[in-house]
């Protein structure tokens, strides 16, 4: 959906079409989805029923094609204000986003965790839809090709270009060291336990396996000073398994595919080891995740990811 005057816009309603007796209990936490680098939220309107209120936030600067003043941190702060003051949402919520939206969601959660008394919402979990580890633009390998995106509207392309410039120097906020705890949670009709330093991984075939992280994560002194008092909310990653097409014939991966062959999309060893609890494969490349051919499958994967987020607990 192209941006409208409403922001955020409600995409799904929990109780719509339900009998009163079915929806009389506590409503599940609403899911707020943040736009991707193109600035729009059309993809989120293709997702099937998630049995909860779902909202989407588009880029307020989309139609003006202007860069965002204040960068990623300014964007995160403004989107929290939209949730609280415009949508009127309070209490526990889930955040999510595709690509850039995952980074913004993580930044919003970090901002709230750093000063929880300043906000009316708290973050119960994060759904990251193919948000690979962010390599700042200045650190990309020389000759990194652009993705081959066909038929992209001018405003979407300008939004993508603005994001490229915004991410040239920006780095993700840090959450601190791992707690060293084991965790338990449910997925589908199964219950799982993960040991410290492991992540649950589900392939397209539906088989689950524990993946051991290969690199321990250590903080610099400066990063330690920026760590919130609480740990990160649980996150689940959707991982596209196909490399995106690129311009030219170099054969090199584009920006979003720098870590495509890694099961954790580059996050291993670079971030808090407690944050990502599971990775679920998606039958697509990065820019094709919400193709109508896969939307039913993606919807079920998102439901499973949310179930993991909502059931994860330390295994004590």
UniProtKB/Swiss-Prot annotation:
Question: What name does this protein carry?
Answer: Probable thioesterase lcsE
Q: Which SUPFAM superfamilies match?
A: alpha/beta-Hydrolases (SSF53474)
What does UniProt give as the signal peptide span?
none
Which GO MF terms does the UniProt record name?
Answer: hydrolase activity
EC number(s) in its UniProt entry?
Answer: 3.1.-.-
Record carries keyword Nucleotide-binding: no
Tell me which InterPro entries the record gives.
AB_hydrolase_1, AB_hydrolase_fold
Q: In which pathway does it act?
A: Secondary metabolite biosynthesis
Short name of any one Pfam family annotated for the protein:
Abhydrolase_6
Q: Report the function annotation for this chain.
A: Probable thioesterase; part of the gene cluster that mediates the biosynthesis of the lipopeptide antibiotics leucinostatins that show extensive biological activities, including antimalarial, antiviral, antibacterial, antifungal, and antitumor activities, as well as phytotoxic.
Residues in a coiled coil are: none
What switches on its expression?
Expression is positively regulated by the leucinostatins biosynthesis cluster-specific transcription regulator lcsF.
Similarity comment: family membership: Belongs to the AMT4 thioesterase family.
Sorted UniProt keywords: Hydrolase
What gene codes for this chain? lcsE
- Phenotype seen when the gene is deleted: Abolishes the production of leucinostatins A and B.
């Amino acid at each position: 959906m192209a941006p409208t005057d409403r922001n955020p816009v409600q995409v799904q309603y929990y109780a719509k079409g339900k009998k009163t007796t079915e929806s009389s209990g506590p409503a599940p936490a609403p899911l707020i989805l943040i736009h991707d680098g193109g600035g729009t939220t059309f993809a989120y309107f293709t997702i099937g029923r998630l049995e909860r209120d779902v909202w989407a936030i588009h880029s307020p600067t989309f139609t003006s094609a202007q860069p965002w003043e204040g960068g990623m941190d300014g964007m995160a702060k403004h989107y929290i204000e939209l949730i609280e003051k415009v949508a009127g949402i309070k209490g526990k919520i889930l955040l999510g986003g595709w690509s850039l939206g995952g980074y913004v969601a993580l930044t919003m959660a970090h901002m709230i965790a750093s000063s929880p008394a300043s906000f009316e919402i708290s973050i119960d979990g994060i759904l990251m839809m193919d948000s690979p580890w962010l390599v700042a633009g200045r650190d990309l390998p020389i000759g990194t090709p652009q993705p081959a995106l066909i038929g992209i509207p001018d405003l979407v392309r300008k939004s993508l270009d603005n994001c490229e410039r915004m991410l040239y120097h920006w780095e993700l906020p840090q959450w601190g060291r791992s707690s060293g705890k084991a965790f338990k949670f449910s997925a589908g009709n199964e219950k799982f336990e993960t040991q410290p330093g492991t992540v649950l991984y589900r392939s397209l075939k539906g088989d689950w396996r524990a993946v051991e992280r290969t690199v321990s994560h250590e903080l610099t002194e400066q990063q330690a000073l920026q760590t919130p008092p609480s740990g990160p909310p649980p996150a689940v990653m959707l991982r596209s398994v196909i490399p995106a097409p690129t311009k030219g014939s170099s054969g090199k991966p584009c920006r979003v595919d720098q870590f495509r062959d890694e099961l954790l999309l580059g996050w291993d060893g670079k971030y808090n080891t407690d944050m990502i609890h599971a990775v679920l494969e998606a039958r697509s490349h990065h820019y094709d995740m919400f193709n109508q051919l896969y939307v039913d499958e993606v919807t079920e994967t998102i439901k499973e990811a949310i179930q993991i987020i909502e059931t994860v607990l330390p295994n004590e």
